[in-house]
C-alpha cells in the first residue's frame, strides 16, 4: 500500500477542524509507543486495562505490529497479520517484543513477533509485508448504506441516553455503568443502536463508526495499520454474544486468535465503518468476521477472530 494521502474522502478531518497543532493521538504517543532495548527487541508499557483486568488484545497486536514494522524498509507495508493469544497478559508488568526476520524478499517480507512476560510467551504473530504492486485484478464488496457519523450519537451520549431511561433492564444498566467508567483512546458511534428496555436476542451483526482520538496525520501508513490493529479488537468478539444475551451471561470470554488483511491505504484518525458479524458459534467458541470501510466506500481492512466464550444461565429477576 502507498502512503494514505488523497484517499478520496471528501469529509477528511473537516468535522474535526485543523488538528495538526493538536496533541498527537494517545495511541501514538503512549499506547503503541515502544522502547528499543536491542536490535529487534522492544519493551512496551502504558497499558489500557479493560474490566477483565487482563491486557487488551488489541494493544498487544498493535504493539507487536509496531515492532515488526520497525524491521522492514520504508517502501513495504503490511498486508496480512495472523496472531495467537496463548496466555493472559499481566497489566502490571511490561511486555517484551522479540522480532524474528523470517524472510526479506524483493516483493514480500515476513516477520514473526513473540510477546513475553515473566519469561513466557503470551502472544505470537506473523506479519507479511509487501512492496506496492499495481494489478488489473481488482474487486470488492459494496459498503453497507448507513447514516453518516455526524447523524449519530457518540458512545458517551448514547450510554447516557440509555441510563436515563427508567425502563432500562438492570443487567444492561450494570454493564453500561461499567463501560461508561472506562476511558478508551477511540471514538465510537453505533449504527442502529438497539432498545434495551428488556433482555432480547439480537442478530449476530453490528456496525459502528470508529476512529482514533486525536491526530495521527497523513504520512505514516505503518502507524495507521498499527492503530487499526488496536481498533479491530474492540467489541469484536461480543458480536457472537448478541443472539444469546437474553438467556445467558458471560462467565469467561477471551480472544484465541486474530487475523487481519490490509487492502487499501486509510487514516485511522478518520471515521471508518466497522461492519461485524458472527457466522458461527459452538463448542464454547465464537467466530467473528469484520470489515473496516473508508467513508468513500473503499474496503480498507478485513478481520477475523475466534474466541473462547463460556456462558452461564441468566437468573431471572423473579427468582431473586
From Swiss-Prot:
<dbReference type="GO" id="GO:0036109">
    <property type="term" value="P:alpha-linolenic acid metabolic process"/>
</dbReference>
<comment type="similarity">
    <text>Belongs to the C/M/P thioester hydrolase family.</text>
</comment>
<feature type="short sequence motif" description="Microbody targeting signal">
    <location>
        <begin position="318"/>
        <end position="320"/>
    </location>
</feature>
<dbReference type="InterPro" id="IPR003703">
    <property type="entry name" value="Acyl_CoA_thio"/>
</dbReference>
<feature type="active site" description="Charge relay system">
    <location>
        <position position="233"/>
    </location>
</feature>
<dbReference type="InterPro" id="IPR049450">
    <property type="entry name" value="ACOT8-like_C"/>
</dbReference>
<feature type="active site" description="Charge relay system">
    <location>
        <position position="305"/>
    </location>
</feature>
<dbReference type="GO" id="GO:0047603">
    <property type="term" value="F:acetoacetyl-CoA hydrolase activity"/>
</dbReference>
<dbReference type="GO" id="GO:0003986">
    <property type="term" value="F:acetyl-CoA hydrolase activity"/>
</dbReference>
<dbReference type="Pfam" id="PF13622">
    <property type="entry name" value="4HBT_3"/>
</dbReference>
<dbReference type="GO" id="GO:0005782">
    <property type="term" value="C:peroxisomal matrix"/>
</dbReference>
<keyword id="KW-0576">Peroxisome</keyword>
<dbReference type="GO" id="GO:0010561">
    <property type="term" value="P:negative regulation of glycoprotein biosynthetic process"/>
</dbReference>
<dbReference type="Pfam" id="PF20789">
    <property type="entry name" value="4HBT_3C"/>
</dbReference>
<dbReference type="GO" id="GO:0052816">
    <property type="term" value="F:long-chain fatty acyl-CoA hydrolase activity"/>
</dbReference>
<protein>
    <recommendedName>
        <fullName>Acyl-coenzyme A thioesterase 8</fullName>
        <ecNumber>3.1.2.1</ecNumber>
        <ecNumber>3.1.2.11</ecNumber>
        <ecNumber>3.1.2.2</ecNumber>
        <ecNumber>3.1.2.3</ecNumber>
        <ecNumber>3.1.2.5</ecNumber>
        <ecNumber>3.1.2.27</ecNumber>
    </recommendedName>
</protein>
<comment type="subunit">
    <text>homodimer.</text>
</comment>
<keyword id="KW-0378">Hydrolase</keyword>
<feature type="active site" description="Charge relay system">
    <location>
        <position position="255"/>
    </location>
</feature>
<keyword id="KW-0276">Fatty acid metabolism</keyword>
<dbReference type="GO" id="GO:0004778">
    <property type="term" value="F:succinyl-CoA hydrolase activity"/>
</dbReference>
<dbReference type="GO" id="GO:0006637">
    <property type="term" value="P:acyl-CoA metabolic process"/>
</dbReference>
<dbReference type="InterPro" id="IPR049449">
    <property type="entry name" value="TesB_ACOT8-like_N"/>
</dbReference>
<dbReference type="InterPro" id="IPR042171">
    <property type="entry name" value="Acyl-CoA_hotdog"/>
</dbReference>
<dbReference type="GO" id="GO:0005739">
    <property type="term" value="C:mitochondrion"/>
</dbReference>
<dbReference type="GO" id="GO:0047617">
    <property type="term" value="F:fatty acyl-CoA hydrolase activity"/>
</dbReference>
<dbReference type="InterPro" id="IPR029069">
    <property type="entry name" value="HotDog_dom_sf"/>
</dbReference>
<dbReference type="GO" id="GO:0052689">
    <property type="term" value="F:carboxylic ester hydrolase activity"/>
</dbReference>
<keyword id="KW-0719">Serine esterase</keyword>
<comment type="pathway">
    <text>Lipid metabolism; fatty acid metabolism.</text>
</comment>
<dbReference type="GO" id="GO:0042759">
    <property type="term" value="P:long-chain fatty acid biosynthetic process"/>
</dbReference>
<dbReference type="GO" id="GO:0033882">
    <property type="term" value="F:choloyl-CoA hydrolase activity"/>
</dbReference>
<dbReference type="GO" id="GO:0005777">
    <property type="term" value="C:peroxisome"/>
</dbReference>
<dbReference type="GO" id="GO:0043649">
    <property type="term" value="P:dicarboxylic acid catabolic process"/>
</dbReference>
<dbReference type="GO" id="GO:0052815">
    <property type="term" value="F:medium-chain fatty acyl-CoA hydrolase activity"/>
</dbReference>
<dbReference type="GO" id="GO:1901570">
    <property type="term" value="P:fatty acid derivative biosynthetic process"/>
</dbReference>
<dbReference type="GO" id="GO:0047994">
    <property type="term" value="F:hydroxymethylglutaryl-CoA hydrolase activity"/>
</dbReference>
<comment type="function">
    <text>Catalyzes the hydrolysis of acyl-CoAs into free fatty acids and coenzyme A (CoASH), regulating their respective intracellular levels. Displays no strong substrate specificity with respect to the carboxylic acid moiety of Acyl-CoAs. Hydrolyzes medium length (C2 to C20) straight-chain, saturated and unsaturated acyl-CoAS but is inactive towards substrates with longer aliphatic chains. Moreover, it catalyzes the hydrolysis of CoA esters of bile acids, such as choloyl-CoA and chenodeoxycholoyl-CoA and competes with bile acid CoA:amino acid N-acyltransferase (BAAT).</text>
</comment>
<keyword id="KW-0443">Lipid metabolism</keyword>
<dbReference type="GO" id="GO:0006636">
    <property type="term" value="P:unsaturated fatty acid biosynthetic process"/>
</dbReference>
<keyword id="KW-0962">Peroxisome biogenesis</keyword>
<dbReference type="GO" id="GO:0016559">
    <property type="term" value="P:peroxisome fission"/>
</dbReference>
Amino acid at each position: 500500500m502507498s502512503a494514505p494521502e488523497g484517499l478520496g474522502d471528501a469529509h477528511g478531518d473537516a468535522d474535526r477542524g485543523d488538528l495538526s497543532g493538536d496533541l498527537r493521538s494517545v495511541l501514538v504517543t503512549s499506547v503503541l509507543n515502544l522502547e528499543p532495548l536491542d536490535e529487534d527487541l522492544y519493551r512496551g508499557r502504558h497499558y489500557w486495562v479493560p474490566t477483565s483486568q487482563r491486557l487488551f488484545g488489541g494493544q498487544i497486536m498493535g504493539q507487536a505490529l509496531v515492532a515488526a514494522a520497525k524491521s522492514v524498509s520504508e517502501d513495504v507495508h503490511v498486508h496480512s497479520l495472523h496472531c495467537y493469544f496463548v496466555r493472559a497478559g499481566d497489566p502490571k508488568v511490561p511486555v517484551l517484543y522479540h522480532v524474528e526476520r523470517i524472510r526479506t524478499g524483493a516483493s514480500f517480507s515476513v516477520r514473526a513477533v513473540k510477546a513475553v512476560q515473566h519469561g513466557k510467551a503470551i502472544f505470537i504473530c506473523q506479519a507479511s509485508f509487501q512492496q506496492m504492486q499495481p494489478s488489473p485484478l481488482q474487486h470488492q464488496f459494496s459498503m453497507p448504506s448507513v447514516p453518516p457519523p455526524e447523524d449519530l450519537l457518540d458512545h458517551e451520549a448514547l450510554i447516557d441516553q440509555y441510563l436515563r431511561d427508567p425502563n432500562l433492564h438492570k443487567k444492561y444498566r450494570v454493564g453500561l455503568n461499567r463501560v461508561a467508567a472506562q476511558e478508551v483512546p477511540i471514538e465510537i458511534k453505533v449504527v442502529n443502536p438497539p432498545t434495551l428496555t428488556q433482555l432480547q436476542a439480537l442478530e449476530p451483526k453490528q456496525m459502528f463508526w470508529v476512529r482514533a482520538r486525536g491526530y495521527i496525520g497523513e504520512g505514516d501508513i505503518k502507524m495507521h495499520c498499527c492503530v487499526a490493529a488496536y481498533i479491530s479488537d474492540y467489541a469484536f468478539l461480543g458480536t457472537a454474544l448478541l443472539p444469546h444475551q437474553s438467556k445467558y451471561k458471560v462467565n469467561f470470554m477471551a480472544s484465541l486468535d486474530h487475523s487481519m488483511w490490509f487492502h487499501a491505504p486509510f487514516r485511522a484518525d478518520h471515521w471508518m465503518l466497522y461492519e461485524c458479524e458472527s457466522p458461527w458459534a459452538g463448542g464454547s467458541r465464537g467466530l467473528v468476521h469484520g470489515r473496516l470501510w473508508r467513508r468513500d466506500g473503499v474496503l480498507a481492512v478485513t478481520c477475523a477472530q475466534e474466541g473462547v466464550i463460556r456462558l452461564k444461565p441468566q437468573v431471572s429477576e423473579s427468582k431473586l
